[in-house]
Amino acid sequence: MNENGRHQGQHEVLIRKYFLSCSYGSASEIADFFASDATIYDTNHQPISSREQIGQFWIDTREQWNGATWHVDSVIESDQSAAIEWTMKGTLDGDEVIFHGSEHYTIVGGVIREIRQYWSWRRNALTSGLLGYDYPDA
């Protein structure tokens, strides 16, 4: 069960553990969630390919945002796919930053094969997400 009393599917459990690893784990712990030929596609940077590069990418990103943490806000899943909304919290130059985004997963054999990440970042803004949407405190 999740915090809303709803049963979690196997993909949701995997993704929530992956997000905990992105927030607090090592590069190798993060890499363990991915197939060897996995790729992350993103609206803000070039694709990241291979589980090792993905693991190191999240360590670098966490450091860039001074101990950033990621939080799963909602999940919908089916046979080999899942879609989530997420929140990232971190700091930049002493100011809190909060980003919101959406990801689409392909999961095969209990590991992540592909993520397509959608979010926007404007250097002069300390938050991102849907315009006019009242996000709950994640």
Describe these PLM feature segments.
Residues A35, D42, L92:
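Acidic surface patches and DE-rich sequence motifs
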